């Protein structure tokens, strides 16, 4: 894992935890769990440590099944942010273009993923300077809040990860609001 500031680290770790738990993903769990212990902000560190404990204590197949039920089989809690509350596909297309522009403005392009995929957005915010990260997270904040509310409603532990993201976003917005 690259050297980052604490909020960047939080964003990378939450991005990782929102990724599909493939065989390669499981191979990185211990390294990422160790990185969670070095997160500077105590509340974020505690949430990440507890989530990694949950992951490490889970049976991989059961964890994968729960992940798929939470994100792949649920329209309400999937990780593609423009699909929530969307019946106007023209508006969804406009949102996708706006998300794509966030990546292009930062010098990145996505070849194999849609630009509204939450882990990709979190990785992008972790890879750019704080001011741009604050802008990216502010642009997606309403969608993050909606997803968080739906995860809470569904009683899914991933809601705690969005708490980490949203408090990190608020912190970045406060630091860059000059």
Task: Please place each PLM-identified region on the residue numbering.
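Charged, alpha-helix-forming regions
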Residues: 1-110, 114-116, 123-178
């Amino acid at each position: 894992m690259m050297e980052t500031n604490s909020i960047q680290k939080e964003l990378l770790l939450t991005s990782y935890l929102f990724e599909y738990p493939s065989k390669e993903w499981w191979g990185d769990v211990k390294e990422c769990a160790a990185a969670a212990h070095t997160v500077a902000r105590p509340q974020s560190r505690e949430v990440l440590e507890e989530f990694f404990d949950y992951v490490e204590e889970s049976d991989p197949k059961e964890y994968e099944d729960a992940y798929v039920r939470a994100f792949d089989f649920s329209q309400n809690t999937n990780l593609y942010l423009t699909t929530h509350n969307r019946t106007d596909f023209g508006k969804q297309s406009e949102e996708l273009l706006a998300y794509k522009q966030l990546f292009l403005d930062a010098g990145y392009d996505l070849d194999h993923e849609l630009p509204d995929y939450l882990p990709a957005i979190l990785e992008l915010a972790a890879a750019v300077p704080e001011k741009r990260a604050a802008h990216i997270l502010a642009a997606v904040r309403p969608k993050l809040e909606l997803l968080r509310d739906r995860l809470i409603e569904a009683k899914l532990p991933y809601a705690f990860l969005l708490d980490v993201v949203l408090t990190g976003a608020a912190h970045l917005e406060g630091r860059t609001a000059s």
